[in-house]
Every structure is written in structure tokens, then in C-alpha cells.
Amino acid sequence: MTTAAPHDIIRVRGARQNNLRGLDVDIPKRRITVFTGVSGSGKSSLVFGTIAAESQRLINETYSAFVQQFMASPARPDVESLEGLSATIVVDQERMGSNGRSTVGTATDAYTMLRILFSRIGDPHAGTSGAFSFNLPEGMCPRCEGTGRVSSIDLDALIDRSKSLEGGALDAIPNFVVGGWYWKGLAESGLYPADVPIAEFTAEQMDAFLHRPATRMAIAGMTMTYEGLLVKVTRLYLAKEAAQPHIRAFADRVATFAVCPECGGGRLTRAALGSRIAGRNIAECSAMQATDLAGWLRGMQAPSVAPIVETLLGTLDALVQVGLGYLSLDRESGTLSGGEAQRVKMVRHLGSSLTDVTYVFDEPTAGLHPHDVSRMIELLRRLRDKGNTVLVVEHKPEIIEIADHVIDLGPRAGARGGELQFEGTVAGLRASDTLTGRHLGHRVSLKESVRRRAGAVEIRGAATHNLRSIDVDVPLGVLTVVTGVAGSGKSSLLHGSLAGRPGVVVADQSPIRGSRRSNPATYSGVLDAIRAAFAKANGVKPALFSANSAGACPVCKGAGMIFTELGPAATVSSVCEECEGKRFTAEVLEYRLRGKNIHEVLSMPIVDAAEFFAAGAAHTVLARLVDVGLGYLTLGQPLNTLSGGERQRLKLAINMASSGSVYLLDEPMTGLHLADVDTLLGLLDRLVDSGNSVVVIEHHRAVMAHADWVIDVGPGAGHDGGTVVFEGTPAGLAGSGTLTGRALAEYVR
């Protein structure tokens, strides 16, 4: 790199965050810098944990102490010095939350512009823009409060009508067992008999039993509040998100949701839904996919609102450009994949007037078909050309090759990584002897011979979302890859028609439910074997080696951190001073297994733990975790810090023990380095050769070329997709002329 002025460089010295080993790098400003290296090599620790975290911390310090108490401020990263930082905007793959009130339209501000448009020229006039907001009292439907759905309870799942209250009619409800406090409030109310089957209640008794609102009355010799069963169950278990898994499972079992009869799912008042432009109301416009809504707006002849239309079109065109033209503005943000969520966040910034800021991206091509990667490249260049610094963590060669500067970390993951392997141009990286450099031109050959199928799973009339009554046979006993552009209907086909069938194991990238205490050791079950080994070696009970039980630090209760709630602000965490973050009591940490205590074992990378436990049940599980490419994770790493790809591979490892199953995987190559692709392909082969069937949704062309059978869905996205455009072998796909076929033909050697 040529010599540059100090203010043209982000200078990092002595970075030791996580596994970084005193890293020194110079990052040019107003350029695209791509960070490469195997998963766990330290890329995110440098870009997110050091540069972005310190930028955010310094910005937060500019606010008053009063304001700072309501902000989540990251701790200072472990680095000697950072110079030349600018304001940093992180565009990651973190999902956008599961709140149903957040939609693509609200997240991109497109719905705000649409509300202003309807408030100006909607006929009849319904009020200001607030009248068209389902998140404001003046606009939301009074029945569903702006959600578009009303909940009800499945009575048959809640109670056993053939039994009496004394006979256990309410046993399916948590905490309503016979003799319990909640049970007594109903059974001893005197409003209906407790010894008669519920099916024999009169209409009046049934109404009191189910629906009576909160009423003060004498029950069992004391004055207490009586509530009908549905009223009480709704208040206790359905009115708020439950924390305990068994309560969540109960709520999922008994709660049903239906379209609100008042607004028809439109979320708004009748007045707002009655206001129209060119025959459409705002809910109908929000339900159109972005490409169609943009076309409708371009046909609008209304000079008085031309600036609003132009701004809205800019946002819609940006959605199309990032490969999300198939989304509608009313699509709930929580239903987006990690890659989709990242691209929606990107749309917010494309029209920004800010310049000379640092944008940080985490694999922006995740979930993108090869056909759409060129659009992403253009967007990254646009951000750079506006005078911004663009930092990208990426594995795909197409993105690496557009870099102005490359920083390669490694050589391996975890404790074996964290070192600078290469810094310079793409040409220099290609000529280097680093792992990334050697694999940059990675290509595969089409499979010469494919496995013979052993039957098939028939899918008939699949019409979920944009699917057009698809009939397709998914072969068994082989590796099947389902391809197509983002939004073509791949996930709708498999998750809507294949998932849920007997014997189908789904390993996707969705978050793993659990507390902040959950980690790979607890989720995989290997902690039980580890605790048993410690207990046997020291002659004590296994519970001592659980941070959730007898061995937990009494101050932090085994969390290792002290969490302080700050009212409306984010929770602040600090390392527990009693156990110094080790989670266990000092007494427990004295017990050793082959020279190591339980904290040291849980701090091991999984690949080291597999060597430490060289045999037995623990080794079997740990070896599977290494096989799926997770050897760099530590056993005690919190699950909420894992990426979508890491979560998927963890689920896959847990389910690998069974045979005769159909494994359904959704983009398992996400987050994998080029050098790890062949390893995961070998794992998929082993699954098939062990008598399983593997069905993979994937954009990576190496996986397509390695398949036994390919199902290509398309031809486009949204209503331009939803059909099967090709079925056959990879060789047949490469010569088919479809978008996927052409991309595969360009890739194979």
C-alpha cells in the first residue's frame, strides 16, 4: 500500500480482542477493504469487536452522563491504540426482532412516505399521516390494536370436557393441577359443580367458567378475585412473552391466530382503509411486492406529491437493487432471514447524505444467488464512491476480487488464528501462499457419476406463498440441492411441504431458544458427560460442576456476569468480581481432571476438547462438532453470540447420530471459508452414505456441482417465480440455460 497521510488511514496497533495476537494493521479510508480468513480466525473480533465497538464507545462518550445511562455502551476493546476512526455504521445479519409491528416498510421508512402520500391525496381524506399508522392509536384498528390478527384459544387443547374439575379436566394447563391455588379459585367458586364433567355444564355455567371478567367474591372462606378460565389463562400465559420453555410450549399449543374480522388484516381503522388512491388503499399497496408497487407509483400523475413519490421510488428501487424486489412493505421484519435483514438495513443507508463514515458489513452476499451478487458489488462501490470507508467480512471470491485492500487473518481458527497472514492487493493475495490465497481460484468439476435414488417424497399442489401448485418428487437416498434466486420459492417449497413430515430433520439458521447461559456444551448434551468425568475423578457429585446448580457462584448465580437493569435502557453487564467471570465457586475450581478445572475445560476450543476427551460419549459428540466446522468455538461460548450459519451447523451436529432420516439444510455454506467447503461436502456425503437423504437449499455453486439431483425454482422472485424450471443432474443444469444453470456453467472447470 502506498504511503498515505495519517488522516487517510485507520491505524490499529496491538489488537488483542478475543483471539487476536497483538495485531497491527493499517486500513485505508474511502476504500473497500475485505477481511478474509477461515471462520473463527479473528475477522469479526477485529472489525466488529475492535474497530466498530471503539467507534461506538467514543461516540457515546460525547453525550451527557444523563443520556449515557439510557444507552448500551460497549466496553473498551483490548487494543493498545486506534487512530483515524470515523463514525461507524454496522450493517450485520442480526435479525430485526420478532415484534409484529416492525415491517419492511417501517424499517426502511417506505411506509412513512406511503402514509404521507395517502394523507395528502387519499380520497376521501382520512386525516394526517398518523391516521394511517397501525402503531399509533389514531390509526390502529381498535379490535386487533394494529396487529391485523386476533388471538383465540383452542378449548379442546386447553381442557378435557369429558372430565370434571375434580377429575383433572385442567391438568393440561401449567399450575392448574387438582388441589392447586389456581384450581381452587375455579373449583371452589360455587358458580358451577366441580364433580360434573364440563361437557354437562349449562350455558350459564359455561359462560361463568370460561368468560366471567375479574370479580371480587368469597371463595373457600376468603375474599379473592375470580376470573373465568380463558380470562385467567390469557392474562397469565398469553398476554406477554413467556420466559420458561414449558410455558412457551403451552402457549404455542393452545393459542390460535386468525385474521382480524374488523380490519381484514389491514391493521388500520375503517376510515384509513376507506381512503384510496387510484382504487387502492394503503393496506393493498403495502401488500404489493416492491417491484409492482414501484410500477404503480410510476404511473401516478400527481404533481403535488411528486417529491414524495420520488423519495418512495428511491427506496423501492434500492430494495430491488439489493435483490429484495419480491418483498412487500407489510412483510414482518422478524420473518426475514439474516441475509435479507442485512440488505433491508442497507437500503436505509443508500439514500443517506452522510459521507466519510465507515460502513461495516458481515457477509453481505449471504442468501444471494450468484446472479444477484453483481448488484451487491455495485452497491458497495456506490457507498465507497460517496467518500465512505467500506469494511467487509466476506468469503466469496466475487467480493474479495473487488477489494481495494485485503487483510487476511489466520492461519486457522480460535487459538490457532488471530495473526496477520497477508495485507495488500487482491493480486498479491492470489500470489501469496496463504490458505485464502491458495483457494481464491477454487473451482470444482461437475459430478461424473451420481447416486441412484431409493424412492422419493412426493410433493403435490404446493401453493405456499408464491408457489404455483408445484408437483415435484424429492428423491431419497441422495444429495438433492434446491436452487433459485432469492425469493423464488425454495424455502416455501421445502419448509412448507417437506418440513414437519415424519423422519425429516430440519437444521436451519433460526435462533436457538435458550437463556444467556446456554452454550455448545449444554445444547449438545456433552456437558453431562464432562460433569460425570469430573465427578468420577474427584469422588463428588456431578451437580457441583454445573453453573446452574450446586457449583454456581453465589453472587452471579453461575452467569459469570452481573446484569443491571436500567429501566428503559439496555441491560448493562459487568464481570462478576467474586468468581472473576468463571461462573463456579472457588471450591469447585479446585477439582481437577487431568490437570484442568471445569472452567478451563469449558474455555477450550471444541477441537482441543475433542483431543482432551479422546474417547467415550464426550468425544463422539465433540468430533461431530469438529466435523461440521465448529472446532474453533469454545465449549462455553454463549449461543446468542453465534451466527446463523454456526447455529445451523450446531443443529446438524446434534442430529447426525440418527440414520434413515431426511436432513433439510438451509444454506449450510453460510460463513464457511473456501478451504472448508470441501470438508462440509465430505460431511454431506457421509450422511448420505450412512443411509440418510440430504436436501439442501444452497446458492454456493460448489454444492450444486456436487449434488446427485438438482431442483431449480424460478425463473425469478416473488410472483415471477414459484415454478420448477429444472429437475435433473448438475451436468444437465449447467446446460439448461436457466439463471442458475448459466451461473453454474461459468463456475465449473
Predicted segments with their positions:
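Conserved phosphate-binding elements of NTP-dependent enzyme cores
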Residues: 1-749
